[in-house]
Amino acid sequence: MAHPGRRGYDNREIVLKYIHYKLSQRGYDWAAGEDRPPVPPAPAPAAAPAAVAAAGASSHHRPEPPGSAAASEVPPAEGLRPAPPGVHLALRQAGDEFSRRYQRDFAQMSGQLHLTPFTAHGRFVAVVEELFRDGVNWGRIVAFFEFGGVMCVESVNREMSPLVDNIATWMTEYLNRHLHNWIQDNGGWDAFVELYGNSMRPLFDFSWISLKTILSLVLVGACITLGAYLGHK
């Protein structure tokens, strides 16, 4: 249930701290950027974004060169609050569980991304729009964060660290424009913590998905329905 009059937590802060955590797991030191102003949630679109059939078909989404994280210059939005530690902890634990279940797939997927400063945005858009094409649930949101983390780690591995700021911006913008209302309507991040952040047992109720499978199908131009792979929460 949404909380009237409450805009929720600052999604950008949640993204930045998650990315910082994922990079620190690999021994990379990246500033979480708490001093960066938040990106205000945008009005919900009239219709869900159309799925991108292939990364090569993502010409509708112009790639952004490194350093073009325009959203980081948006002034702070009133009503956004920093998320409490429990939100960050629950999300990290959920992402780690996802990663453990698909450790081999993640290793293979990193080699398939073929990231460059001018392909990264197309890869991100194709996979994320495909991920949520069949709807939203908490499991898919966790997958979204973990995929973003993989992209950031791969960017640093390939000595393209400036891409990390861009990926953080793309994740924040997608959360604000396409996922914020769903999150608020389902109790906000506090509900996520209540449902999945204490015993961690309910995490096994997620119908997880191999992100490698999504990525592979997107890259070869297959248009898939994720309902066959990822169930509802």
Swiss-Prot record:
This is Apoptosis regulator Bcl-2. It is a single-pass membrane protein. It is found in: Mitochondrion outer membrane; Nucleus membrane; Endoplasmic reticulum membrane; Cytoplasm. Its main location: mitochondrion. The keyword Heme does not apply. A motif (BH1) lies at residues 130-149. Belongs to the Bcl-2 family.
